[in-house]
Amino acid sequence: MQNVQSLMMIITSDTYPAKRNSNTQKKLYKENKNTNEMAVWYSGGGLDQNEKFIYDSLNRDLKLKCSDDSRQMGQKTILAFEWAIENVDFKYLIRPTPSSFVNFSYLKGLYKEKLDDKDIVYAGTVQTIEYENKPKLIFVSGSTLILNKQCVELIIKNQNKWDHSLWDDVALSKLMTELEIKL
């Protein structure tokens, strides 16, 4: 099991522009020689009944047993988090999109200054949305999501409460609110 400070799990798909953007990202991150950082690109795929996921360590591609449809992002995210817990010893999980650039040097400073002393980390760029005439929901954008291992474990433990009718970043915020986890 690889041990890293930062595990970057990039949600992607086999559709345009995600595939193009992921290929560009791989040029930046795949050859990263820092052993304290790891990048993995995950998507849904056509796996057979006996496989939950397949990981290609050379290309850092993780295929998950779920649809690659954009409305299945929540399921893809939960399965990717399960894979992460089972296969990588990490302190922080960064969940960007294929069009995001992650500055690991900046993150190291952020961890030290603001996150290392927290029990549960749910952080990133905060946005607000209103839906279905309900109160405003504050959420962390899926392009900049930062979680610690304890938060990822909590998400997996409570995955039955995930609202799959919402985009995954909004559904995650709803779950964090229900669990009384603050930004």
Stretches with model-predicted labels:
Residues 3, 21-37:
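Short, acidic, metal-binding catalytic loop of nucleotide-sugar glycosyltransferases
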Residues 7-11, 39-40, 144-146, 174:
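Conserved, well-structured core segments
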Residues 68, 74, 92-96, 100-183:
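Conserved catalytic core of nucleotide-sugar-dependent glycosyltransferases
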Residues 40-91, 101-105:
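Active-site-proximal specificity loops/subdomain of glycosyltransferases
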Residues 25-27, 49-50, 77-83, 132-133, ...:
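Eukaryotic intrinsically disordered and solvent-exposed regulatory patches
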Residues 27-31, 79-87, 110-113:
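A generic secondary-structure signal
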